[in-house]
From Swiss-Prot:
Alphabetical keyword list: Cell projection, Cilium, Developmental protein, Repeat, TPR repeat, WD repeat
Primary gene name: osm-1
Organism field: Caenorhabditis elegans
Record's function text: Component of the intraflagellar transport (IFT) complex B required for transport of proteins in the motile cilium. May be required for ciliary entrance and transport of specific ciliary cargo proteins such as che-3 which are related to motility. Required for the maintenance and formation of chemosensory cilia that detect chemosensory cues.
Protein name from the UniProt record: Intraflagellar transport protein osm-1
Location(s) in or outside the cell: Cell projection, Cilium
Subcellular location, principal: other
TPR repeats by residue range: 700-737, 803-836, 848-881, 907-940, 979-1012, 1037-1070, 1137-1170
Subunit-level organization: Component of the IFT complex B composed of at least che-2, che-13, dyf-1, dyf-3, dyf-6, dyf-11, dyf-13, ift-20, ift-74, ift-81, ifta-2, osm-1, osm-5 and osm-6.
GO cellular component, one term: intraciliary transport particle B
Disruption phenotype annotation: Worms display defects in ciliary structure resulting in defects in ability and osmotic avoidance behavior.
WD repeats mapped onto the chain: 14-53, 63-103, 110-150, 151-189, 191-229, 233-273, 511-553
GO biological process: cilium assembly; dauer entry; intraciliary transport; non-motile cilium assembly
Tissue: Expressed in amphid and phasmid chemosensory neurons, where it appears to concentrate at the base of the transition zones, which correspond to the basal bodies of motile and sensory cilia. Moves in the retrograde direction along cilia and dendrites, suggesting that it is retrieved from the distal endings of the cilia by a retrograde transport pathway that moves it along cilia and then dendrites, back to the neuronal cell body.
Domain of life: Eukaryota
């Protein structure tokens, strides 16, 4: 954008005359300038001053100069100006939309301090900033002002976000506060060092120009984005700022300079443009940017105002519209014909790439990268919506205030002036006649706006969508296809016409449809009215009031209606008559009435009604004007309207309201209609009582609200309101209500009030008094006391009887146990159901009678279907059947009849029911009933009557005999035939099996179609024959079309073609040939057609079908050369030669060579003539023609003569002719082929010297082939014999190549194999050559080839041996499997021996894995052997070799390696390996200190064995289970001991594990286990110290027994109540070292004299050792953590258990002291149990 000085608007004055504010109207048509003399100058859109008015002070007594104008802004609708003044007031002036309107104050807001700044974001709300720091909001309608928030600093600026979602206020202390409209919250977002007087709010945040010569950019959150500092430049302080309408550009003004900043979407930042300097401007204090973005107005301190042009570039469209780009996203379009301007702006800030003018040059379409902008140049409104244009969209501009975009079956509605789409629908019917949309203009009040779309969902269904809420308002289904629809202007009615030209009017709100006109050729709403004009024939129909569609005005016209035109004075229908266009004028007065109401011109509407008082609908029209006038606050007009219809009450009421309004206007200003009492009274008049109540309550006028209801006798609403508001006189109000009810005789209403007060007894009396016994009964039932009061209930019952509510009286008497009266009144009230229900237990004998009476009652009232069941209950089946029949309940009637015992009665009913089913068409059921009733003839007649002859025949045959039936039906058929009832006769003929009679009948009367139909159905084999017969008949009669049809249907299209050919109807013949006969047939007929007409006509015909060339060829092929010459001469002269050649060819075939040669020459093909004479050996004529016409063929003539000489053996003459023909190469080739080598060399040397060397070489090769050169000769000879097919000589020659003739082994092998191939192919029947070849192959060591030959010779065994010698094992095995299966093992054995001897293990594995593994083991390649065994996926094989290797490693005492092997390959459950596992366990546990890693490895191996044994259910499972438990407990204890005793839980857990290990002393080192358990118990102390003594004492006994070698010395009696083994094998040596042993021995001895030790096991509540699993009840499961028995607090972990407390302790220990070994234990337990460990709660 560039800034350019444009012009001076107001000249500067000599002294100070500051322009305080410049404001531009949102519609771009005006600009207001606040001058120093307290006046406001108004400029038009061209910057010319058109008006000026002076501002007023808050009070005239202060004088006209008692204030200054501080701020000013336009309203959103541009019709008002708000002016803030220093004398604490805000005035709103109405300036209107035209220049001649008077400027009046419409709102006055008195403020507590001076108004410093303004912003007007919404029509009804204005933001006010004040000197005292308050930010207030003014409500325009109520003329009230309230504070939004308050600060202590003056408000220096207020700016609203472009999208009106929030605003910011700037204050004297530099703070900026953001207020959000939706959340109604404010927050301080930043604070500047200087007051932010110059502030704008853009789409990209805040821009502030400060007095310290800086321009700052902030985000909405107060974060600094950019800073432009001009302190280092010759710049003065910034004095004003303005933002363009797109909020993409900002201009900042200083002393004499304007600086431009533009937002860069690409950079996301502000870019500074070139500044504009204005000399002598002297401080620009005010800026205003026109809404079209083209001009900036700048005001100075000296009172001068000038304009600045803002433009990027300019251009022209259609030589009429000037485009001015004020920004990439803002274009001004100026129509140079009338100087109107239109803004095209992208509110998204996108660059406008393309502009198009559409819709009769009224509408502008702007395209951006991702949106589309549509602008109306007349209304100056534009809209932008997101759109990805593919260039295929269509635009419909036929509708007011909106545009339709059609794209890919979607209809998008765009309202001018509103961004985004108004709505969209999907339909394939997108013609503008099938779409109608009505969108109200911006001048319509919000609550009256209409936005509706009518469209076709399918050709017969109309949908009407409310575009405001997106809901479907109406869905209209029509019987036929609709071809035109249109909504009226208010979208309250819809007109549509269907394709049968019927016009229908639909009232959308009531869905009422009225057919207005049939055979309609034109229909239209009169513009800007609800009048309908339609034409049908020469009749023009007008509906002036569509609400009364029956009131139609008709006039005769003499043409077709073209259009309906309307202006201010008249409305005319333009009719195109035969001679000219004629205008028929409509009653414009009636139309104007509706238009006046639409425009709210009530005075004009009243004037119309006053001049038309005699109309039939005048009353409704006065009412309509009155209601609309009231709605728009025009009370005088409303009063006049009500007076016209003599509604005195409303006239008086309006008079009172007007008096109140006049009084209010004095106090609050305006016309007083905004006064709350006026608004409330108007709401009361409109019966909007809740609205009036709300208005009163908003003003805290409770008395008036309640008084309104009481005056209207709406006591309930008054009481409800009083109760909600806690009205102090509520009780008095209620008393007044009761008194009023009593005075007016409203006892029932009083009773309701009594009920609500809880006085039920009084309420009941009042209900009875008001003759409302049901309400009394309801009140009594709701009172637990009164519902049991017999007197009250009898009073109510009597009242019910008086009111003839007998059924309710019966209920009361039933409650009183007076069953007789209850039943009596139930019957009187026809409540038979209740009577029967009561009688079932009170009077059972009356139930049947009551059922009968109930049935009779239902029958009496016509409820026959209900009566049926009651007659059945009363066992009156006849009445039941009759009721069912009268109710037309035929199935029910039939079921009842079947239960009647009297056959005679039943038969009568069957007939009646059968008649029903017969009439209904249920013939099968009717037949059954007729037969059941014995009415056979009725059944037969039924079928005959309904032309069901087959069924009639069947029944007749069944009941009257076949012969009689056939005779009767044949006669009937013939009779029908004679009377022309052929269809019925046909059915009868077919029914009796005589279809030929029907065929003959139809053939006789000439109904060929029926003949064909019956022949096809019953004699299909004669169908083609019949059709051909008919075709011949038609042909004879001259009906060739019918004949053609039958020929074609018979598949004989050739006959049809011949028929037309014979009749010379060539076009028809050609048509059939083309469609039925294929391409060849088509051509034949066409050529025959052409031949028949000849000449130019034939050429034209063939050219028409593009067949001229093919026609010439066809003529030639058929010998019609005269026709061919004619066609070529006339239409294709270039084909004349071809015709001559074709004729010459035919003449040659006929032997007429001389004539043929002439035509060859005329056809420019003399060479063909020469060739013809050569073929005929006529050398003279051939030489003559060649010399005359084609000398190039003379060599061919001579060559032919030479060939003849060669054939005769005259070589010399042949040589002469060939040399004359200059073809020495031919005679050379002849001499070579005949091996005449000297002659060949002579010719080559004399005439072809370049070939002499080659001939010499060939001469030498010939000698070689003849055996002159040894082995090479043999090879050459063999090759030559092979080429000649002399296989024996070829083989003999090849076999001569052997060690006797050469030392070249490769040549010998190749020659021998070649000889064998020849023998196999050609000499397999010659044993001599087979033997010779085999001998040679054996000598040459060609075993594979020998095997092939032997196999062909039938020597399978020798062939297999040969393959083995060739080491072709696979082939040998394959051959053996096919021919000698018994040799397969022998071959495999030889193969294995070969592989083994050659050491080829890889191949041996594939053949014999066991042998291969054994070889690896022999080579000590155990890892490779085990990997190979593992790869076989056969576990026993792997286990075998693992066991072998483990045994070897054990023998080597390499136990670590044994563990590694078992871990890698798995431990098997083979008992042979058990000793190894036992050894591993013993050796690992025999070490002085337990190593967790080693124990864990042994434990893991045992787990593998454990799992395998468990799967096999092995007898060794228990043995390994005990070993695994022992290893597990030792491993877990070892892992825990690493933590130490610092954790209290660890010591107890280790103790329990040690005690649990005692049960495994028979498989562990006994002395060690007892020692460790005793030491743990001793160290733990407390109750376990005695146990420690007992166990350590036993340990000493074991040591003594070990030393003595006598296990009987050990006493196991202390362990009787435990599972500690008593038979334990003694170790060979003591485990503990002597020092510790002596120490422990001393402690035991010292403790033995202490009586404190009980010297016994620790027992639990079971009475056994606490670590023992076994007790009297059985064996408990061990705990996974301690090994203790789990008796209670069981936690199930997979397949195992744990005691909850010990499990939790263990897991807590792991969590608080994570070690690698503890985690390993946890993982092992989870794997063993099959479930992870988790803390149990």
């Amino acid at each position: 954008m560039k800034l350019k000085y444009l012009s001076t608007i107001l000249p500067a004055q000599d002294g100070e005359a500051k322009i305080s504010n410049i404001s531009c109207s949102p519609n771009g048509s005006r600009a207001a300038i606040a001058c120093s003399d307290r006046s406001v100058a108004l400029l038009d859109e061209n910057g010319v001053q058109k008006d000026r008015f002076t501002c007023k002070p808050i009070d005239a007594k202060y004088g006209k100069k008692s204030f200054t104008v501080l701020c000013m802004t336009f309203s959103p609708d541009s019709s008002r100006i708000a002016i803030g003044q220093s004398d604490n007031v805000l005035f709103i002036y109405k300036v209107g939309t035209s220049w001649n309107e008077k400027k009046v104050i419409v709102n006055k807001f008195v403020q507590p301090s001076a108004v410093t700044c303004l912003s007007w974001p919404f029509d009804d709300k204005i933001l006010v900033g004040q000197l005292d720091g308050k930010v207030r909001i003014g409500l325009i309608k109520t003329n009230k002002c309230s504070s939004l928030y308050k600060t202590d600093e003056t408000v220096v600026s207020i700016q609203t976000h472009p999208k009106r979602t929030s605003f910011v206020s700037a204050h004297q202390d530099g703070s900026i506060i953001l207020y959000n409209f939706s959340s109604r919250t404010q927050s301080k977002i930043c604070t500047l060092q200087v007051p932010p007087y110059n502030l704008v709010f853009t789409n990209h945040g805040l821009v502030v120009a400060t007095s310290d010569r800086r321009v700052l950019s902030y985000t909405e959150n107060g974060v600094v984005q950019q800073q432009f500092d001009y302190n280092d430049q010759s710049e003065k302080e910034f004095s004003s700022i303005s933002c363009d309408p797109t909020a993409q550009n900002v201009v900042v003004a200083s002393y004499d300079r304007l600086r431009l900043f533009s937002w860069s979407a690409r950079r996301g930042a502000w870019d500074e443009g070139a500044p504009l300097e204005i000399q002598n401007a002297y401080t620009i204090g005010a800026l205003g940017w026109k809404m079209d973005g083209s001009t900036i107005y700048a005001g100075t301190v000296c009172g001068g105002v000038f304009s600045v042009d803002c433009c990027l570039r300019r251009g022209m469209l259609k030589s009429r519209f000037e485009t001015t780009y004020v920004a990439p996203s803002h274009v001004i379009l100026r129509d140079v014909t009338n100087d109107t301007r239109t803004n095209v702006i992208s509110n998204k800030g996108l660059a406008i790439d393309e502009l198009k003018i559409m819709g009769k040059d009224r509408y502008v379409i702007g395209y951006t990268s991702s949106s589309i902008i549509i602008a109306d140049t007349e209304s100056q409104r534009f809209s932008e919506l997101e759109w990805q244009s593919g260039g295929h969209e269509k635009f419909y501009f036929d509708f007011n205030n909106c545009c339709l975009i059609i794209n890919a079956g979607e209809v998008t509605v765009v309202e001018y002036g509103v961004d985004g789409s108004l709505g969209w629908v999907r339909t394939e019917l997108t013609s503008p006649h099938l779409l109608s949309v009505q969108v109200s203009g911006p001048d319509v009040e919000e609550h009256k706006k209409v936005k509706k779309l009518a469209y076709l969902v399918d050709p017969t269904t109309i949908s009407i969508i409310n575009l405001i809420n997106g809901q479907q308002e109406s869905f209209i289904n029509h019987t036929g296809a609709v071809d035109w629809i249109e909504l009226n202007e208010r979208a309250s009615k819809l007109l549509y016409r269907d394709k049968r030209s019927k016009v229908t009017l639909v009232d959308i709100s009531s869905d009422q449809r009225s057919v207005l006109l049939s055979f309609c050729t034109y229909v239209q709403w009169v513009p800007m009215s609800d009048v309908i004009v339609a034409q049908s024939g020469d009749n023009l129909s007008i509906w002036y009031n569509p609400d009364l569609p029956e009131q139609v005005t008709n006039m005769k016209i003499k043409g077709e209606v073209e259009a309906v035109l309307r202006d201010a004075d008249r409305t005319e229908v333009i009719v195109q008559e035969p001679t000219a266009k004629v205008a028929y004028e409509l009653d414009n007065t009636q139309i104007e009435f509706g238009a006046a109401l639409e425009k709210r011109d009530f005075d004009r509407a009243v004037a119309f009604l006053e001049s038309n008082t005699s109309g039939t609908d005048a009353y409704s029209m006065w009412i309509r004007v009155a209601e609309m006038a009231l709605e728009h606050g025009n009370l005088f007009v409303a009063q006049r309207c009500y007076a016209a219809i003599n509604d005195v009450a409303k006239v008086r009421k309006l008079h009172d309201i007007l008096e109140i309004a006049d009084e209010a206007s004095i106090s609050i200003g305006g016309d007083g209609t905004h006064f709350y009492k006026v608004r409330a009274m108007l709401a009361i008049m409109g019966r909007k009582f809740k609205e009036a109540e709300r208005i009163f309550l908003e003003q805290n006028d409770t008395e008036s609200a309640i008084g309104m209801y009481t005056s209207l006798h709406k006591w309930d609403e008054a009481l409800e309101l009083a109760k909600v508001l806690n009205y102090p006189e509520y009780e008095q109000l209620k008393t007044s209500y009761l008194r009023a009810l009593s005075d007016t005789g409203q006892d029932s209403k009083a009773a309701e009030l009594k009920v609500s007060d809880g006085d039920t007894l009084s309420a009941i009396q009042l209900y009875i008094k008001s003759n409302k016994p049901l309400s009394a009964l309801s009140a009594a039932n709701n009172d637990s006391v009164l519902s049991q009061d017999e007197n009250i209930l009898r009073q109510i019952a009597d009242s019910l009887v008086k009111s003839q509510l007998y059924d309710k009286a019966g209920d009361v008497y039933e409650k009183l146990k007076d069953f007789d009266k209850a039943v009596e009144y139930f019957k009187k009230g026809d409540a038979y159901g209740k009577a029967i229900q009561l009688a079932r237990f009170a009077f059972p004998e009356k139930v049947v009678t009551l059922e009968q009476e109930w049935g009779l009652h239902l029958e009496y009232i016509g409820q026959y279907d209900a009566a049926v069941n009651h007659f059945v209950e009363a066992n009156d089946l006849k009445k039941a059947v009759e009721a069912a029949i009268r109710a037309k309940e035929w199935p029910k009637a039939l079921s009842i009849v079947e239960n009647i015992q009297d056959q005679k009665v039943r038969t009568g009913y069957y007939g009646e029911i059968a008649d029903h089913y017969s009439n209904k068409g249920d013939f099968e059921r009717a037949e059954r009933l007729f037969v059941e009733a014995g009415l056979f003839n009725d059944a037969i007649m039924m079928y005959g009557k309904n032309n069901k002859w087959i069924d009639a025949f069947r029944l007749s045959e069944e009941f009257h005999g076949r012969e009689a039936t056939i005779s009767s039906y044949l006669a009937k058929a013939e009779d029908l035939d004679e009377h022309g009832r052929f269809a019925e006769a046909e059915q009868l003929y077919i029914t009796i099996g005589m279809p030929h009679k029907a065929i003959q009948m139809y053939d006789r009367v000439g109904r060929d179609d029926d003949v064909l139909r019956l022949v096809e159905r019953y004699h299909g084999e004669h169908m083609h024959e019949t059709r051909k017969r008919f075709a011949t008949q038609y042909e004879e009669r001259g009906d060739l079309k019918a004949a053609e049809e039958q020929f074609l249907k018979a598949g004989d299209f050739r006959s049809a073609v011949n028929m037309y050919k014979d009749s010379e109807m060539w076009s028809d013949a050609y048509r059939i040939a083309k469609t039925e006969g294929g391409e060849n047939m088509e051509k034949q007929v066409l050529f025959m057609w052409a031949k028949s007409i000849g000449g130019d006509a034939a050429v034209k015909l063939l050219n028409k079908h593009g067949m001229l060339m093919e026609g010439i060829d066809f003529a030639c092929e058929t010998g019609a050369f005269d026709l061919a010459f004619d066609l070529a001469r006339i239409g294709a002269k270039d084909r004349m030669g071809t015709v001559h050649v074709r004729l010459a060819t035919q003449l040659e075939e006929e032997g007429r060579l001389e004539d043929a040669s002439k035509h060859y020459v005329e056809g420019n093909k003399p060479e063909l003539a020469v060739e013809m004479f050569i073929r005929d050996n006529d050398w003279a004529d051939a030489e003559r023609v060649a010399k005359d016409h084609c000398e190039s063929l003379l060599p061919d003539v001579y060559t032919g003569q030479a060939r003849r000489a060669i054939e005769e053996g005259d070589h010399l003459r042949a040589e002469t002719f060939l040399l004359r023909a200059n073809k020495p190469d031919i005679i050379l080739r002849y001499f070579i082929e005949n091996e005449m080598w000297p002659d060949a060399l002579r010719i080559a040397q004399n005439y072809l010297p370049h070939q002499a060397a080659l001939i010499q070489e060939e001469y030498e090769k010939s000698e070689l082939r003849n055996g002159a050169r040894g082995v090479d000769s043999f090879v050459a000879q063999a090759k030559e014999w092979e080429q000649q097919g002399d296989w024996r000589k070829a083989v003999s020659a090849l076999l001569k190549i052997n060690r006797d003739s050469t030392d070249n082994d490769a040549l010998i092998k190749h020659s021998t194999e070649k000889a064998a191939d020849l023998v196999m192919k050609f000499l397999m029947g010659d044993e001599e050559y087979i033997g010779a070849a085999l001998g040679a192959l054996d000598e040459a060591n060609c075993n594979e080839k020998a095997a092939e030959l032997l196999l062909l010779f039938g020597q399978s065994r020798q062939a297999i041996n040969a393959l083995c010698r060739a080491k072709q094992w696979a082939k040998a095995k394959q051959v053996a499997q096919e021919y000698l299966p018994e040799m397969v093992p022998e071959i495999e054995k030889i193969y294995k021996e070969s592989l083994k001897s050659e050491g080829r293990l890889g191949e041996l594995i594939d053949v014999d894995v066991i042998t291969a593994i054994d070889m690896m083991i022999e080579n000590d390649q155990w890892d490779k052997a085990l990997d190979t065994a593992k790869s076989q996926n056969y576990r026993p094989l792997l286990d075998k070799y693992v066991a072998q290797y483990a045994a070897i490693l054990v023998h080597r005492n390499d136990l670590s390696r044994v563990l590694a092997v078992l871990e890698r390959y798995g431990a098997s459950a083979n008992p042979a390996n058990f000793s190894i596992y036992k050894l591993l366990m013993e050796e690992t546990l025999a070490k002085p200190r337990f190593d967790y890693t080693e124990i864990a490895r042994v434990r893991n191996v045992h787990l593998d064995v454990y799992n395998a044994l468990q799967k096999e259910s092995s007898e060794h499972f228990e043995e390994f289970s005990r070993a695994l438990w022992a290893l597990h407990l030792i491993a877990m204890r070892t892992a825990l001991e690493e933590i130490g005793d610092s954790v209290p839980e660890v010591q107890k857990l280790c103790l329990k594990q040690s005690l649990s290990l005692l049960r495994y002393t028979d498989i562990l080192v006994a002395d060690r286990i007892f020692y460790e358990a005793g030491a743990a118990a001793k160290d733990y102390g407390s109750e376990y110290e005695s146990l420690g003594f007992l166990l350590l004492n036993h340990y000493l006994d074991l040591v003594d027994a070990i030393e003595e070698g006598n296990g009987e010395l050990v006493d196991y009696s202390p362990f009787e109540n435990s599972d500690i083994p008593t038979e334990v094998s003694l170790p060979t040596r003591q485990w503990l070292e002597s020092a510790k042993h002596e120490e422990m021995k001393e402690w035991v001895l010292a403790s033995s004299v202490d009586d404190a030790h009980a010297k016994e096991l620790v027992y639990d509540k079971r009475g056994v050792f606490e670590a023992s699993l076994k007790d009297k009840r059985g064996t408990a499961e061990p705990c996974l953590v301690t090994g203790y028995p789990v008796i209670e607090s069981t936690v199930r972990i997979g397949s195992m258990v744990a005691e909850k407390d010990n499990l939790n302790k263990f897991l807590v220990v792991i969590k608080s002291n994570q070690t690698e070994n503890l985690l390993n234990v946890q993982n092992f337990v989870a794997k063993w149990a099959g479930s992870p460990l988790a803390i149990s709660l």
